[in-house]
Design a protein with these regions (language model features):
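A residue-level marker of the well-folded mature domains of exported/periplasmic proteins
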Residues: 1-250
Length: 250
């Protein structure tokens, strides 16, 4: 790809790439995230907040990156409440990437889940996520309580007042911290070059629960009462006692 070409052209310049660990070059820092770990904690919160035991996950496009979110979330739900079920859907199938920007289709999918008794929905779908929040707002207006879970940033902070009432938490992925990390190190004349894959020659850093790369947000205060359980799960993941799957069904 372009970064491979440009990094070879400018060997004395340090480059950074997010969500990609395929460029084998010492002057390319790959910033990758353990989204499955943050999603596991979101699953713990979802299982504890759900009254029906029916939970939903909607990804934007069925690709390995978003299946990491799915796998972790389902594992977190199941570890917390064995009897709970997770309805998994994707807005589009690969290679149709419109699933990241189709809130109308997301809303239809989530409404279908709500009709079947789902009362917590986690969406990892870029711009399509707005459809999840709209569906929950409309359900609330009709007298049905449905919790939503945001993704990447703390979406409570940018939600409308109506959406905030139903936003349980967000799975936060601190791309901001990772990029700052790389730039701050570059300014100091250092590189962020942990070995990610020795055989393939991939360098960079994995951002996970141990270094605050992923997590869940407490804005709104709705999951404050579950903090002990969430912290306990996080501690087990950090110690390796819980191995969170990054592939569905594993």
């Amino acid at each position: 790809g372009p970064i491979t070409t440009v990094s070879q052209e400018f060997p004395n310049t340090q480059f950074g790439i997010v969500d990609d660990a395929s460029v084998a070059a010492l002057n390319v820092t790959s910033m990758v995230f353990s989204e499955e770990q943050g999603s596991y904690l979101a699953g713990v919160a979802a299982a504890l907040a759900s009254k029906s035991g029916k939970i939903g996950y909607v990804g934007g496009v069925r690709i390995p990156l978003l299946q990491k979110f799915e796998a972790g979330f389902v594992a977190g739900v199941k570890a917390t409440k064995k009897s709970a079920t997770v309805d998994v859907k994707y807005v589009t199938e690969f290679p149709d990437f419109s699933g990241f920007n189709d809130p109308a289709k997301m809303k239809v999918i989530v409404k279908g889940m709500i009709d079947k008794g789902v009362d917590v929905v986690y969406s990892a779908a870029g711009g399509s996520g707005a459809g999840n929040f709209q569906a929950a707002t409309e359900a609330a207006a009709a007298g049905t309580k449905v919790w939503t879970i945001g993704v990447d940033s703390d979406q409570y902070l940018t939600a409308s007042s109506a959406e905030k009432k139903n936003m349980l938490t967000s799975m936060t992925k601190r791309v901001d911290n990772a990029v700052y990390d790389v730039i701050a190190n570059a300014v100091a004349g250092r590189t962020v070059n942990d070995i990610l894959d020795a055989k393939a020659g991939i360098y960079g850093r994995r951002y996970d629960l141990t270094n605050g790369g992923v997590g869940v947000s407490y804005s709104g205060g709705y999951i404050n009462k579950y903090k002990a359980q969430i912290d306990a799960a996080a501690a087990k993941i950090k110690s390796g006692a819980i191995k969170v799957p990054s592939v569905p069904g594993k």
